[in-house]
Design a protein with these regions (language model features):
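Amphipathic alpha-helical coiled-coil scaffold segments and their short linker/junction regions
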Residues: 52, 60, 75-77, 97, ...
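Transmembrane beta-barrel architecture of outer-membrane proteins
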Residues: 67-69, 90, 142-144, 190, ...
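Membrane-embedded beta-strand positions in outer-membrane beta-barrel channels/transporters
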Residues: 71, 144-148, 192, 291, ...
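Terminal intrinsically disordered/low-complexity segments used for targeting and assembly
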Residues: 2-76, 124-128, 167, 251-293, ...
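Periplasmic alpha-helical coiled-coil/stalk elements that build and connect Gram-negative outer-membrane
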Residues: 23, 175-290, 401, 405, ...
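Small/polar, glycine/serine/threonine/aspartate-rich low-complexity segments that form flexible
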Residues: 53-62, 109-148, 271-287, 316, ...
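Sec/SRP-type N-terminal targeting helices
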Residues: 82-83, 99, 139, 153-181, ...
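A short glycine-centered flexible hinge/capping loop motif at secondary-structure junctions
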Residues: 223-227, 430-434, 471-475
Length: 478
């Protein structure tokens, strides 16, 4: 070995010795792997559902100002959104707090002390009043002021890993806020269209009640004229009572829905006034294929992903704790035993200190912290894998439900058309003077009941479509 290579080797020897003296790191846990479902998921979907992803403000497609206003109020005033927003601000503040530890710090300090020296103590000579010896005891007023600086050198990347972990938490909280936003919007939309369904059903039931009252009035007139017996009108009276009971049930459901909407929109101070509107025909939206796109569109999966990234950075920080900590410190001060001498050049003092902390024996504390970090990371990965499977199942289940209800609506529409043809025939016979007007009412009642069934199916279809939009992430984009 020549002299040029000998001295660098000697210089590196203390560093190698320090690293060898660090507390040993034990690998006790095996990391889980993140699941990518694209290759395992059957992405075949009905052709009628392949119309593209929903927009992030998907509720605007209904062109309903009432619904838009309700959702906007919920997003602005709902306590859940306020909690989600505060969680983001807390995570951002925590990330900033960790990031500040990675830079130098400079402090200014000043102090003044009035003290009497003990003649019998270690500083006994200073208790004497001997100007020739430089002592003016026993009382002294000493002062110090100046700058102190410190810098923790993040050689092994511990602080950087902690900052990355905190930033991952911030991104996860932002995704959770978006998930809360979509859940709130979906809940408000579902309740709103359920109310509109009940309002439309209420109108149809009132029409049924009107036709039943027409039949009852006709039967009573025939009975009074001695043409029919009282028994023939009993069944109509019973049906009218059932219709009235259904109307009461519908009114009760509408009040419950209004109360729930008021709670979601934080609208308890004044009563909620809704105007009935026609139920829309919602076009189901789903991409041609699922897979990686699904992961990018679900806010809950993005939150789970960022929690995984954060946990991996936490592992890096736990590993970096096994290596030496190096700190640099410096000070520049004025220090004098008498205040009158404090600003003299001779009172100046300065210094630089380099400190090193080497973990050697810690009773397993560092390994325990590393095990905790790895366990939390594995838990985050397992939660992510579970969320992926559940997300794919949610989409498949919601898509199947939308398709099934779409087919039921088609069949119901045909049934309603057939029932209307029966009403048309009865009306024609009435116009020809063949039957009485009450018989037309009797023909209208089954058609109206089928219309009520159609409204319920249409409401179920709307509800399933909104659930499908939520399963697709509600148009969420990173």
């Amino acid at each position: 070995m020549n002299r040029d290579s000998f001295y660098p080797a000697i210089a590196c020897f203390p560093l190698l010795l320090m690293l060898a003296g660090c507390a040993p790191m034990h690998e006790t846990r095996q990391a889980l792997s993140q699941q990518t479902p694209a290759a395992q998921v059957d992405t075949a979907l009905p052709t009628a559902l392949k119309n593209g992803w929903p927009d992030s403000q998907w509720w605007l497609e209904y062109h309903d100002n009432q619904l838009t206003s309700l959702i906007n109020n919920a997003l602005q005033n709902a306590p859940d959104m306020q909690v989600a927003e505060q969680r983001i601000q807390l995570a951002e503040a925590q990330a900033k707090a960790v990031a500040t530890q990675d830079g130098p710090q400079i402090d200014f300090s000043a102090d003044m002390e009035r003290q009497k020296m003990s003649a019998e103590g270690l500083m006994g000579p200073f208790a004497l009043n001997d100007p020739a010896a430089g002592t003016t005891g026993p009382w002294y007023t000493n002062g110090t002021f100046g700058l102190t600086a410190g810098w923790h050198l993040d050689i092994w990347g511990k602080n950087r890993a902690e900052v990355t972990a905190r930033l991952g938490t911030v991104k996860a909280r932002a995704a959770e806020r978006e998930q809360t936003r979509q859940l709130l919007a979906g809940s408000v939309a579902r309740l709103y269209w359920e109310w509109q369904t009940q309002a439309a059903l209420n109108t149809v039931l009132q029409q049924i009640e009107k036709e039943q009252n027409t039949i009852i009035a006709t039967d009573r007139q025939l009975y009074q004229n001695g043409i029919t017996s009282s028994v023939e009108g009993v069944e109509t009276d019973i049906n009218a009572s059932k219709t009235r009971q259904q109307l009461n049930d519908v009114a009760g459901k509408m009040k419950i829905i209004e109360a729930r909407l008021s709670a979601l929109t934080n609208h308890q101070t004044k009563s909620l006034k809704l105007i009935p509107v026609a139920l829309p025909k919602v076009a189901s939206q789903l991409p041609d294929e699922l897979g990686y796109s699904l992961l990018a569109r679900r806010a809950d999966l993005q939150a789970a992903h960022w929690y995984v990234e954060s946990s991996l950075s936490t592992i890096d920080a736990a590993k970096a704790a096994f290596y030496p900590d190096i700190n640099l410190m410096a000070f520049l001060q004025q220090d004098a035993l008498h205040l009158s001498d404090l600003f003299r050049h001779s009172a100046q003092q300065m210094g630089v200190t380099a400190g090193l902390t080497l973990p050697i024996f810690d009773s397993g504390r560092l390994n325990a912290n590393l095990d905790i970090a790895k366990a939390e990371s594995n838990l985050s990965i397992a939660s992510y894998n579970k969320a992926v499977v559940e997300a794919v199942n949610d989409v498949a289940r919601a898509a199947s439900q939308v398709q099934t209800l779409a087919e039921k609506n088609q069949h119901q529409a045909q049934i309603e058309r057939d029932a209307l043809r029966v009403v048309g025939l009865a009306q024609a016979r009435f116009n020809a003077g063949i039957i009485a007007g009450s018989r037309v009412s009797e023909a209208r009642i089954p058609a109206l009941r089928e219309r009520a069934n159609g409204l319920l199916l249409q409401g179920q279809w709307l509800d399933a479509s909104i659930q499908l939009t939520g399963a697709l992430g509600g148009g969420y984009k990173r």
